[in-house]
């Protein structure tokens, strides 16, 4: 399994924020962080600004349906603070609502949030510890043989430095990004097809580029298939439908 260290952090957009996650491989635990506003930082809560986790109650919060952010803020809806949570099928839709002034903040994984920051002026990530959590690839119960195969293959890829290179290609230094693309191996693929379900709306984990789904997770799965002699089939679906 792939364990991903998660870090929720605040992203600012005219008084609104994102929670986000930090990628890591191994057995790291996620550290969640808080949020803040560039233009209204330090203002008291109750005026629409978000400068810390303490400011979340009573705010209008956007999340992607079924994500960690969705789970995180659900308790705020029933604590009597008047918090309203808007759930979107795509993180990008929540971001647009934020830019249009319909939300006070958006809660989303860090690396996708960083991509939104790069694409949209006025966004800023503010860090504050909030929660810890593990992420992993998921295989259906009853398929222990595949679980063992994938786990062993991931260990081999880690030991060989392949996982580190894949991560550096997307999230490394300016000198590293784009310099370590995973190259599909020319191997016999006689062991069937590995079908991977994902929501391709989370750059750099998984996203569309020139009509093809790519990203860290997809490169890892391609490397796994190369090792196992399998074809890779990627199915893009709503995040909330990946695990029914």
Task: Label each residue range with its predicted role.
Residues 12-13, 17-21:
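Hydrophobic core
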Residues 21-38:
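Sec-dependent signal peptide cleavage junction
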Residues 31-34, 68-85, 121, 125-129, ...:
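Ligand-binding clefts/hinges and TM-proximal coupling segments of bilobed small-molecule sensing domains
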Residues 36, 47, 60, 65-68, ...:
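Extended ligand-binding regions for polar small-molecule ligands
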Residues 36-38, 84-87, 96, 149, ...:
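Extracytoplasmic small-molecule ligand-binding "clamshell" domains
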Residues 40-91, 110-114, 196-203, 213-228:
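Bilobed "Venus flytrap"/periplasmic-binding protein-like clamshell domains
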Residues 71-77, 92, 96-131, 241-244:
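A ligand-binding cleft/hinge motif common to bilobed small-molecule-binding domains
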């Amino acid at each position: 399994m792939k364990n991903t260290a998660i870090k929720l952090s605040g992203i600012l957009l005219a008084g609104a924020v994102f929670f986000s996650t930090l990628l890591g491989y191994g057995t790291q635990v996620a550290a969640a962080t808080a949020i803040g506003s560039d233009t209204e930082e330090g203002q008291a809560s109750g005026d629409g600004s978000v400068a810390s986790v303490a400011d979340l109650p009573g705010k209008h919060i956007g999340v992607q349906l079924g994500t960690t952010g969705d789970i995180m803020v659900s308790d705020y809806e029933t604590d009597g603070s008047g918090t309203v949570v808007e759930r979107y099928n795509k993180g990008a839709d929540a971001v647009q609502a934020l830019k249009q002034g319909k939300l006070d903040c958006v809660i989303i994984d860090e690396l996708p949030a960083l991509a939104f920051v790069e694409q949209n002026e006025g966004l800023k990530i503010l860090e504050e510890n909030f929660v810890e959590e593990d992420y992993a690839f998921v295989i259906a119960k009853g398929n222990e043989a595949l679980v063992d195969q994938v786990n062993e293959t991931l260990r081999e890829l880690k030991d060989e430095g392949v996982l580190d290179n894949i991560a550096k290609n997307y999230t490394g230094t300016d000198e590293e990004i784009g310099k370590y693309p995973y190259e599909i191996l020319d191997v016999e693929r006689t062991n069937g097809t590995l079908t991977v379900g994902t929501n391709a709306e989370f750059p750099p984990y998984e996203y569309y580029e020139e009509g093809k789904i790519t990203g860290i997770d997809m490169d890892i799965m391609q490397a796994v298939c190369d090792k196992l002699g399998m074809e890779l089939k990627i199915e893009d679906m709503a995040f909330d439908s990946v695990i029914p």
